[in-house]
């Protein structure tokens, strides 16, 4: 696959993730958009690692590290969303003012 095609795909994923993160009012949707952004970054890491040096796997290893961090972030984020939903009965971002009881 050509480098330009993969970079365009990654740019589309990143743009969709940023747009969803900006316009999202639901916490779960915002977390999903954040994961989409991280996956676009992973695609770039693997693509540039393969394009510049096939013998070294630095981009692939760093991508696996980012996936592990993203999994931990998703687990913690969903736990926080679950806790907020139990207390506030809503997952909307604008209704979850934690400073006001």
From Swiss-Prot:
Q: What class of enzyme is it?
A: translocase
GO MF annotations, alphabetized: oxidoreductase activity, acting on NAD(P)H, quinone or similar compound as acceptor; quinone binding
Claim: rRNA processing is one of the keywords in the record: no
> Catalytic activity, per the record?
a plastoquinone + NADH + (n+1) H(+)(in) = a plastoquinol + NAD(+) + n H(+)(out); a plastoquinone + NADPH + (n+1) H(+)(in) = a plastoquinol + NADP(+) + n H(+)(out)
Q: Name one GO biological process term.
A: photosynthesis, light reaction
Q: Which Gene3D superfamilies match?
A: 1.10.287.3510
Membrane topology summary? Multi-pass membrane protein
Q: List all membrane-crossing ranges.
A: 2-22, 32-52, 61-81
Chief location of this protein within or outside the cell: plastid
Cellular component GO terms, alphabetical:
chloroplast thylakoid membrane; NADH dehydrogenase complex
EC number(s) from the headed UniProt entry: 7.1.1.-
Q: Which InterPro entries match?
A: NADH_UbQ_OxRdtase_chain4L/K, NUOK/Mnh_C1-like
Assigned keywords, A-Z: Chloroplast, Membrane, NAD, NADP, Plastid, Plastoquinone, Quinone, Thylakoid, Translocase, Transmembrane, Transmembrane helix, Transport
Q: Where in the cell is it found?
A: Plastid, Chloroplast thylakoid membrane
Subunit structure, briefly?
NDH is composed of at least 16 different subunits, 5 of which are encoded in the nucleus.
Family the entry assigns: Belongs to the complex I subunit 4L family.
What this chain does, per the record? NDH shuttles electrons from NAD(P)H:plastoquinone, via FMN and iron-sulfur (Fe-S) centers, to quinones in the photosynthetic chain and possibly in a chloroplast respiratory chain. The immediate electron acceptor for the enzyme in this species is believed to be plastoquinone. Couples the redox reaction to proton translocation, and thus conserves the redox energy in a proton gradient.
Q: What is this protein called?
A: NAD(P)H-quinone oxidoreductase subunit 4L, chloroplastic
To which species is this protein native? Cicer arietinum (Chickpea)
């Amino acid at each position: 696959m050509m480098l330009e095609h993969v970079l365009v795909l990654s740019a589309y994923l990143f743009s969709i993730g940023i747009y969803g993160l900006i316009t999202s009012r639901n916490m779960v949707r915002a977390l999903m958009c954040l994961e989409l952004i991280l996956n676009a970054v992973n695609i770039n890491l693997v693509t540039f690692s393969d394009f510049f040096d096939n013998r070294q796997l630095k981009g692939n290893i760093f991508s696996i590290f980012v996936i592990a961090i993203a999994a931990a972030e998703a687990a913690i984020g969903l736990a926080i969303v679950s806790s907020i939903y139990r207390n506030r009965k809503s997952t909307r971002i604008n209704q979850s003012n934690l400073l006001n009881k």
